[in-house]
């Protein structure tokens, strides 16, 4: 999910979530 962590990441807060819009197992989203 390395690419997902980069793609599904908002530059403000980095909150680990479950399956996100990126499609990775655990991405950083919002």
Curated annotation (Swiss-Prot):
What are the record keywords, sorted? Antimicrobial, Fungicide
**Record GO biological process:** defense response to fungus; killing of cells of another organism
Q: Which domain of life is it from?
A: Eukaryota
Protein name per Swiss-Prot or TrEMBL? Antifungal protein Lap
Q: What does this protein do?
A: Displays antifungal activity against M.arachidicola and P.piricola, but not against R.solani, C.gossypii and C.comatus. Inhibits mycelial growth in P.piricola with an IC(50) of 70 nM. Displays very low cell-free translation inhibitory activity in a rabbit reticulocyte lysate system (IC(50)=70 uM) but is able to inhibit HIV-1 reverse transcriptase activity (IC(50)=5.2 nM).
Species: Lyophyllum shimeji (Hon-shimeji)
